[in-house]
Amino acid sequence: MENNDNKQKKTFHYVLLVTFLIIILIGLVCVLFVFRNNLKAQNDYNSVKSSVEATTAQIENSDTDLAENPIDFDALANTNDEIYAWITIPNTNIDYPVLQSKTSDLFYIDHDVNKNYLFAGSIYSEFSNLRNFSDRDTVLYGHNMLDGSMFADLHKFEDEDFFNENKYIYIYQKNRKLTYEIVSAYNYDSRHIMNSFNFADDNVFQEYINDVMNPHSDVRNVNSDVELNLDSKLLTLSTCLNGNNDGRFLVQGVLIKDEPTY
């Protein structure tokens, strides 16, 4: 009887060990898959960036009275005609094309610039926003990736010193550069901004910009030197909260310069 008990214990321990090893193996495979996927994505984005950077010849032949545009949008259109802008934030890893699908709002939540599946997705806007940034608020979305890619670096603006020292967001389009001064950065709830507010109503928009300047959040930084009014054009960058998918972290800026580029 004792021998049977020992055999059962050994069998149980063996099964437990095998199960544990299988779980570890599956975990390692998943980590490897995510790592390779993210590495491929970063390489793809770097390749896209290098292929569409304006050449020295283009710069030298340009009208020097115009602002510099580092992106060759003609080359970018050959990659994907749903790319309509490029976003850059100094001192962050945020330096990406901006897309808007013609068929599905959520397509680029898990697809790259080449329209291939990618867990990290892309930086994108939805149908509720025009592609010319003329709306009272344009919302761009990006994942909060653990490797620091996509919109993960938005969380740097939680730090007051970083927030105060890095004030601008740059959006490039063909022959155009938009400069936004950052107004606020804060934790927000899970509401869909464009579906929750009727920005055509001046009263609604006024209340909204009041909240932008005075967010209802314990985690917030605000640039009190900026003034917003009914003519303001906002840019909202939205990503997940750290360790919490039931809310958003927002960095919001106001358009201060819209200039032609070569």
What feature does the model see in each segment?
Residues 15-33:
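Sec-dependent N-terminal signal peptides of Gram-positive bacterial secreted proteins and lipoproteins
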Residues 2-3, 17, 22, 42, ...:
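N-terminal leader/presequence segments that precede the conserved core
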Residues 27-262:
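Solvent-exposed, non-transmembrane regions of membrane-associated and secreted proteins
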